Amino acid sequence: DSNCMYKCTRNFYEEPVNIRNTKLIAAQNGYDTVIGEINAGTADGKKVAVVGAGPAGIASAYFLARAGASVTVFEKEEKAGGVIRYVIPGFRISDDAIDKDVSFIQKMGVEIKTGTEVKSVQELKAQGYDAVIVATGANKPGTLKLEKGETINALKFLRDFKATDGKVALGKNVVVIGGGNTAMDTARAAKRTEGVEHVYLVYRRTKRYMPAAEDELLEVLEEGVEFKELLSPVSLENGKLLCKKMELGSMDASGRAGVTETGETEEVLADTVIVAVGEKVPTEFYEANGIAVNERGKARINDKTMETSAEGVYVVGDGARGAATIVEAIRDAQVAAKAILGHDIVKGQPVPGTEKDCYSKKAILKESKDAANESERCLTCNKVCENCVDVCPNRANISIKVPGMAMNQVIHVDYMCNECGNCKSFCPYASAPYKDKFTLFASEADMADSTNDGFAVINPETKECKVRLLGQISDCKADDANDKLYEGLRRLICAVIDDYSYLIMK
């Protein structure tokens, strides 16, 4: 499943909406119709250069062109597509699918200059570009030095595998070292390579702590790759890889169990050892262009804009955060595009469904049958999400109607909460509602014992309250339009006092 499916609210009823397959069907069946309707957005005068035509670069160009910017993409390879075209195996995605993505941005007026390597962002600025987006990826191979014997890098192998259609000389026994998604692609490609009989996936932790997606690992195992956990490679000699046996230890800074040596060793048959660990970002490019980097060599960026220390220069995708997913690259591209444009990509996008439609789907079981009908199972939690209300055993999170507001608002009632954490566990966002929701306190004393933003009603008749907002406590009269409190919060407090007075402790 994709990350969005792990967070899908449908999980609480039966199984998630099959978002991944639904999007695939939409892309495959809708292309011919959509491509004919695509046009560039209304020109807004912005001129932007994008360095790199991988997923992050293509997404950046798409969002900018859709909003009317003039965009030129510079790509050092002969074709656009980045690692997806040159590294990701064809059994994962076809060149035809990549070509279709590229055709979208070309139809929107984006110019793509292939075979063109950019070394200076200042030269681009001198050519009149208002902003430069660097989307060069994490294409610097990670290394793992053995005491004896040589290894080959996974990115090089995958590139050779794709270029030769699997005719790479590896021998009969191949060991892939690593636990990420790149290691999974490498193992599957090695299994398909001419002359290979056995592929072993060696990882120093257990399956539980692998960074690879669960479905990626399952595919590897289903295809016959042999998984060997708790092994750390030492040396390659005479067709055998000597490994130290490891055991799990205490948790490290990443939240995964650390490993310690047991003192034992194990040998794994290996004619070739492929290392799929730690692809790195192109630090040298950043430094040469005056872009500040952190201790790991990644560009220092403003997370809200993706802008670097060099004014008007943005870094997106793997080049900003290290090897990650295409979805994360697209997110970065959208953030950077909005920052450059100074507004949303498309204004006034309609939200499908009414509030009644959203509520009517709750608590109705609807099992997945086929991807074409999955949209009927969607609970539209991007519009109405009240999981924290539904799962609280004490009913401490309450949905209330606020006059003048289109949607219900959720408040947290402090004195009804025992901090069980249920709402945090079920929240599809990175939130803990019992801490983050605007909170109704029974008294000033209770407010003093908490750090939550919220309010305590001092006098219901005069609507006098104590309010904490952004950590600052102040007195207010909720029905006073001249009060300095935000209009929305005044309305919410008035709704509690007028329509939900049973919540106020006398």
Question: What is each stretch, according to the model?
Answer:
Residues 1-2, 34-49, 85-86, 114-117, ...:
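Ferredoxin-like iron-sulfur electron-transfer modules
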Residues 316-344:
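A conserved FAD-binding loop/helix module that cradles the flavin
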Residues 1-26, 72, 79, 144-145, ...:
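Iron-sulfur cluster-binding cysteine motifs and their immediate structural context
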Residues 27-42, 100-120, 141-194, 294-304, ...:
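Glycine-rich dinucleotide-binding loop and its adjacent helix/turn
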Residues 149-171, 251-323:
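FAD-site-proximal beta/loop scaffold in flavoenzymes
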Residues 1-72, 76-77, 84-91, 134, ...:
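Fe-S ferredoxin-like electron-transfer domains
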Residues 16-20, 46-117, 141-147, 185-230, ...:
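Beta1-alpha1 glycine-rich phosphate/pyrophosphate-binding loop at the start
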Residues 129-137, 177, 270-277:
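Short hydrophobic core segments
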